Regions:
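Exported/periplasmic ABC-transporter solute-binding proteins
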Residues: 24-50, 54-73, 82-83, 87-106, ...
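Sec/Tat signal peptide C-region and signal peptidase I cleavage site
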Residues: 18-24
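Bacterial N-terminal signal peptides that target proteins for export
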Residues: 1-9
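Short active-site segment of divalent metal-dependent hydrolases/proteases
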Residues: 79
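Hydrophobic helical h-region of N-terminal Sec-dependent signal peptides
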Residues: 9-14, 18
Length: 224
């Protein structure tokens, strides 16, 4: 996914939020999935220049953000990395009714350090993950609660590789922490979203998980 498209859509979301709410006109508090850090930071700066309205963004895994909102953390807008944690927020009646919609989609990709010898990995049922990792760990958000990890577990399970890969995971609290392990070459491979990969100069995409191995990677948002 092109970084500019992410920024454009994030900007459109903020504009719609301003138009549909009566909260304080000098500040918008956004709780956003860590995968949107770069795009939302850029659009927030431009938005303030254009409107004199400050966008205060808090980034973490969607599970962490949803639970913070449940505990009373103030937010005007919640942007989740998957539908599951938006479902959670809605079920807990933390969101304004009828404000949920899918902001954009994403890809699930395999990354390696920029200077790694690995250039292309065909991800299928024949992929030899142990050989690819060569004694190292596969960095990914914790599949127990982090959306990117949940998608990764689903994809690897459908490829018949989960039992092999599970003990080899380096589990992190959010997608950006997983990518950071690959950037620092502490892990030879990682699973992130396409939007994260293009935001880093230190990693490269070496494979894309087939779309039919996991649920669509969708980024929903809603007003709190």
């Amino acid at each position: 996914m092109k970084k500019g498209l992410v920024s454009l859509l994030a900007g459109a979301t903020l504009t719609l939020t301003m138009a549909s709410h009566s909260f304080a006109a000098d500040k918008i508090t956004v709780f956003a999935a860590a995968s949107l850090t770069n795009a939302l930071n850029e659009i927030s700066e431009q938005y303030k220049k254009d409107t004199n309205v400050e966008v205060v963004a808090s980034y973490a895994s969607s599970s962490t953000l949803a639970r913070q909102i449940e505990q009373g953390a103030p937010a005007n807008l919640f942007i989740s990395a998957d539908q599951q944690w938006m479902d959670f927020a809605i079920d807990k009646k933390l969101m304004v009714e009828n404000t949920r919609y899918t902001l954009l989609g994403n890809e699930l990709v395999l990354i390696a350090p920029k200077d790694a010898k690995i250039d292309k990995v065909e991800i299928n049922k024949q992929t030899d993950w142990k050989k690819l990792l060569d004694g190292g760990r596969l960095a990914v958000g914790d599949p127990d609660h982090v959306p990117v990890g949940i998608y990764a577990k689903e994809a690897l399970s459908n490829l018949g590789a989960w039992e092999t890969v599970d003990p080899l995971l380096a589990r992190t609290n959010n997608v950006r922490s997983g990518m950071a392990l690959v950037e620092r070459q502490e892990a030879p491979l990682g699973i992130v979203y396409g939007s994260d990969a293009v935001a880093s100069q230190k990693v490269k995409v070496v494979g894309v998980f087939p779309a039919d191995t996991h649920k669509p990677v969708e980024i929903p948002n809603g007003d709190c």
